[in-house]
Amino acid sequence: LLSGLLMLPSSAIAAEEFDSFGLVTVLPAEPGDHWVWFAGGGRASLMDAGSAGYLGNVAVGGQALPAFSPDGRFIYMPETFWTRGTRGTRTDIVTVFDASTLLPVDEIAIPAKRAQMLSPIGAVDITDDGKFLAVYNLTPATSLSIIDTAARSLAGEYDIPGCSLVYAAGDRRFVSLCSNGAVLTLSIDDEGRELSKVRQEGFLDPELDPVTERAVRYRDEWLFVSYAGMIHSLDIGANETAFNERWSLFTPEDRADNWHIAGSQHLALDRGNGELFALVHQISSQDEPLSHDGTEVWVYDIAEQRRTRRILLQDPEAGGDTPAGGYKAIMITSGEQPLLLASRAGGGPGPGGGAPEVLVFHARDGSFLHTIKSPPAGALFVPRSDR
């Protein structure tokens, strides 16, 4: 075989055209308005939802749960590694990726106890000024690892007994939800050292109507939704965390018709328009929201606390029917003309139930744009921090 190859005329070899195996490029310093990350187990992939174009990916140790620097330069990714792959000595780090090249530029050692969870919200967050990153730990004791992003080092680990998850609250505070319905606020100084921990009772009733951890941040409010569709607003604008008055996503008529929140990412924001988007479904049982996917998105004016429109999750090019199983996650992109994304993982019952896809709509008027077929797996993240 080798001799036969050597006998080929040189002109034949020279004329052969070889395909490249991919394009290596550098992304713009400023994230595109419609860029969205699909973050799943072991990988996070970046796409442009407007063009349905694939932009790149990063490999991750464990579940990918990114946090983005406010200036858009870096992606912070907590990772977990074992010396024998699935066993052995455990090492936890925060890897710092350059957001333009998607290459790792540094890693920061953290306590080997970070919570590995599927929820896209509550495992890691970054302060509004980008100075400190907090990683939620679960062993089952709970604590927060605080990382100084400028020094690229661990500033400290602080216990949050009886509480879980982490949500940034300005430049030097983080809040966590507690098992009895209280909220714990951790305040730190400019070196990342603990200044105080304040526990405030009565944010919610975990027995009567618990909230999901999948909150969204709108300016100085964290908006949580309960299983019954009540919005619990956590005000972080002042020096002390405060509880705003609760309001309902559903009217009495909606409740009588058995409408409920749905999916694994059931809230999204159009920050420029001050609108909250909720993924909902109509079903007789009021189960855990994650156990059912959504068929509609309802849009609310946050200031007026009222619904303004409904968007059916249907692809008119595919016959206008909502696929069996519905949609699991929603996200709103940035910019003056934001897009609404509705993602489904596939595998549902009935015709077409096995095909993953993302429906893309114009968020402001609900008009359909296109469908992204066979998208990367994972939760949805927008690489901007325009809080």
Kindly label every feature range from the protein language model:
Residues 261-306, 310-348:
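Loop/turn-rich, solvent-exposed surfaces of beta-rich toroidal or solenoidal domains
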Residues 49-51, 99-101, 148-152, 188-191, ...:
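Short loop/turn segments that connect beta-strands within beta-propeller blades
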Residues 104-145, 149-167:
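Asp-box/WD-like beta-propeller blade repeats and closely related beta-sheet repeat scaffolds
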Residues 18-31, 61-79, 116-126, 161-173, ...:
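Beta-rich, blade/repeat-based domains predominating
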Residues 23-32, 78-91, 278-294, 344-354:
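Short, conserved, GDST-rich strand-edge loop motifs in beta-rich repeat architectures
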Residues 16-19, 51-58, 62-64, 103-115, ...:
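A short beta-strand motif characteristic of beta-propeller blades
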Residues 36, 75, 133, 174-175, ...:
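Hydrophobic beta-strand positions that form the internal "hydrophobic ladder"
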